[in-house]
């Protein structure tokens, strides 16, 4: 007899803005960021098993599938928290580049929480999934919501913001270069320099006031893009800087490092400009290019069935 199963997309993210105002006494960094889901995505397939075993397979041999993978950790966290006696077989079709600042692992973990909540019929109380998600990683709670969300504190205090309707969606190109840098190395490099002391990026302040007032005003994203990691990472890996230069030379209205890198995204005026640029950009060896669009919270929740 076939076991109950479920397949869900697992979307990537970019950061419209990412500021690190300082480091807290507990060693964690303060974060001010504006996160956005985009259409680039993995696929996760779940099938119940007769025992409590959690197994993971992946079509990308570079992705570890053992107990350290966030997908497996998410499943075990649910089993332990709610004393689940069922198991799960999970298959990951990996399309989001790994260790590229696009939140792939965090997205996979969040989608696993949502899928197993349904397949294992857990029905947790309010906030319990978010609590588990926050323990798995700073970006995991965001992927329970999707869309455009402001994150502050250590990155787990979330404030959803008005998402643009489909006609105003943003057309993007993401480039992932061959060079990479770990999140830990990025933070270490940032710590060696003065952290942000200026006021919050205008996009954060304006967006928060819109959320509070219930009125949305057009954003000039290309004028507000900011990432505190850019200067240090561009110095460490000049190849990553060249991806931004390539996007701007191809006509991007603005371009920015995604998260702590190594991917860079560019914003284009529309679908035609996006397609033209994707065909014209001269890719260096090992570079990967991903044309995509923003995914609103409504679209996101519909896609993952929440």
Regions found by a protein language model. Name each.
Residues 1-100, 118, 122-130, 152, ...:
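ATP-binding N-lobe of GHMP and related small-molecule kinases
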Residues 87, 109, 113-150, 154-157:
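Contiguous, small/hydrophobic- and glycine-enriched helical/loop subdomains that border
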Residues 145, 150-254, 269-306:
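Conserved, helical-rich catalytic subdomain that frames metal- and/or nucleotide-binding sites
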Residues 91-120, 138, 253-268:
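Glycine/serine-rich anion-binding loops at beta->alpha junctions
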Residues 42-46, 139-143, 149-150, 264-266:
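Short beta-strand scaffold segments in enzyme catalytic cores
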Residues 16, 44-46, 71, 105, ...:
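Residue-level signal for inorganic ion chemistry
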Residues 35-38, 133, 246-247, 281:
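Hydrophobic C-terminal alpha-helix "anchor/cap" residues
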Residues 50-62, 112, 134, 215-226:
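Short, basic/glycine-rich phosphate-binding loops at helix/coil junctions
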